[in-house]
């Protein structure tokens, strides 16, 4: 999964994004296969998150970006409040209290929904934008989907390295 996706919105790049978004849940499941509950909840290194905490972090980040995508598709240039995925959103939702299997199932369901929405978009809809509080630039649906992919690729690569898979 050592891939990078251009910031240029093209049909090819959209296809790559959809492909990676489809593969990520499978990768997470494969990486967790055979790990005990203890292994899933212990830090992956000194000062590091556990696999469960990492998955929680991915869910929090995806939730914020997906919400931005959905708003951009529903409202013309919506304004999106700025709050941190982990420190604010995570503190409210407390996904960190769930078991890994529940988190992974939740991640898979969220991903199915996101993929259904994105796969039905016309290319022009990928250009719809949202503006986040405190930022001058507008971010497109493409940009936010790319953000999810790039963030998840980094974490998958890190997990593969730390788990030796």
Please give the residue ranges for each predicted region:
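Short, contiguous alpha-helical
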Residues: 4-5, 41-87, 115, 127-165
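A short, mixed-charge helix-start or loop-turn motif at secondary-structure junctions
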Residues: 6-14, 93-97, 137-141
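Acidic/histidine-rich alpha-helical segments that form the ligand environment
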Residues: 20-25, 31, 88-127
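Extreme N-terminal tail/first-helix region
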Residues: 1-26
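N-terminal first-folded block
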Residues: 27, 35-39
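Hydrophobic residues in alpha-helical segments
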Residues: 32-35, 72-73, 118
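A generic "alpha-helical surface" signal
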Residues: 15, 19-22, 52-56, 101, ...
């Amino acid at each position: 999964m050592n891939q990078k996706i251009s910031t240029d919105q093209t049909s090819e790049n959209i296809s790559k994004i959809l492909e990676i978004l489809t593969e990520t849940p499978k990768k997470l499941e494969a990486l967790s296969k055979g790990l005990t509950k203890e292994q899933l909840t212990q830090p992956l290194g000194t000062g590091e998150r556990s696999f469960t905490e990492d998955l929680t972090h991915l869910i929090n980040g995806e939730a914020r970006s997906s919400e931005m995508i959905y708003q951009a598709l529903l409202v013309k240039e919506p304004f999106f409040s700025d709050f941190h995925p982990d420190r604010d959103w995570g503190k409210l939702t407390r996904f960190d209290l769930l078991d890994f299997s529940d988190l992974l199932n939740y991640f898979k369901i969220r991903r199915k929904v996101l993929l259904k929405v994105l796969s039905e978009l016309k290319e022009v809809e990928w250009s719809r934008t949202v503006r986040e509080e405190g930022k001058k630039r507008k971010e497109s649906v493409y940009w936010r989907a790319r953000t999810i992919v790039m963030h998840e690729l980094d974490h998958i690569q890190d997990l593969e390295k730390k788990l030796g898979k």
